[in-house]
């Protein structure tokens, strides 16, 4: 897909600088860096924050939600170890930026968002950009999307106090889940690998996400 009509030389220059920052911070996957270099993050940011589109920081997108810091997007995506043929479940569509990164790197993306307005806005952005491998659902992300399970990869972009049971069930044997786990104010990002009935955790570092709300998440 050619995004030139949505871009400017200034934005492209800022993306290149951002990619260099991400490299310096330890992101190694060239595929992930290429996706960040390609995708116009400014299209996913509210008008009042346009000047900050390519800063390495999270930004508000309304409804108490945020578009994640680019480093965290890159870290989570890199941790999924996508080869290009995966079916991915994303919990928390948000602005749709992480969704677009995933759509560049995997075969099919199934994304669930509980806030209707955010889902509709993300859907419009991704359609305008030409992505036709993304499927959207309005609902409780802690329940996953059972209809299309199992998934090769699951990415959760909100913080849970534990792994929601439905997501464990919907992850394919041998699959990978990336999820922030902890309290409301601070969590650790984990890469979870499923092997039979066992789930092996690898700690990727401290993070701060908005709470994952739903039947198997925070209740308020």
Curated annotation (Swiss-Prot):
SUPFAM superfamilies: S-adenosyl-L-methionine-dependent methyltransferases (SSF53335). Gene3D superfamilies: Vaccinia Virus protein VP39. GO terms for cellular component: cytoplasm. Coiled coil: none annotated. It comes from the Bacteria. One of its GO terms (biological process) is methylation. It is found in: Cytoplasm. It is an enzyme of class 2 (transferase). Keywords: Cytoplasm, Methyltransferase, S-adenosyl-L-methionine, Transferase. InterPro entries: PCMT (IPR000682), SAM-dependent_MTases_sf (IPR029063). Belongs to the methyltransferase superfamily. L-isoaspartyl/D-aspartyl protein methyltransferase family. This is Protein-L-isoaspartate O-methyltransferase. It comes from Dictyoglomus thermophilum (strain ATCC 35947 / DSM 3960 / H-6-12). The lineage of its organism: Bacteria, Pseudomonadati, Dictyoglomota, Dictyoglomia, Dictyoglomales.
């Amino acid at each position: 897909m050619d995004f030139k009509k949505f871009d400017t030389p200034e934005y492209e220059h800022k993306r290149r600088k951002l990619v260099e920052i991400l490299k310096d911070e330890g992101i190694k996957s060239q595929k992930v860096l290429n996706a960040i270099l390609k995708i116009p993050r400014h299209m996913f940011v509210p008008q009042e924050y346009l000047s900050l589109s390519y800063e390495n920081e999270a930004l508000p997108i309304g409804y108490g939600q945020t578009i994640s810091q680019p480093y965290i997007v890159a870290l989570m995506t890199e941790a999924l170890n996508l080869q290009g043929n995966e079916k991915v479940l994303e919990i928390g569509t948000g602005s749709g930026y992480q969704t677009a990164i995933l759509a560049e790197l995997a075969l099919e993306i199934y994304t669930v968002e509980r806030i209707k307005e955010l889902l509709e806005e993300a859907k419009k952005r991704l359609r305008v950009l030409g992505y036709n491998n993304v499927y959207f659902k309005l609902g409780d992300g802690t329940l996953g999307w059972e209809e299309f399970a199992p998934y090769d990869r699951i990415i959760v972009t909100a913080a849970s106090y534990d792994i929601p049971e439905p997501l464990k069930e919907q992850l394919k044997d041998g699959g990978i889940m990336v999820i922030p786990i902890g309290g409301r104010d601070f969590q650790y990002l984990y890469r979870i690998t499923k092997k039979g009935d066992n789930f092996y955790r690898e700690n990727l570092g401290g993070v701060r996400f908005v709470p994952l709300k739903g039947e198997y998440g925070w209740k308020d």
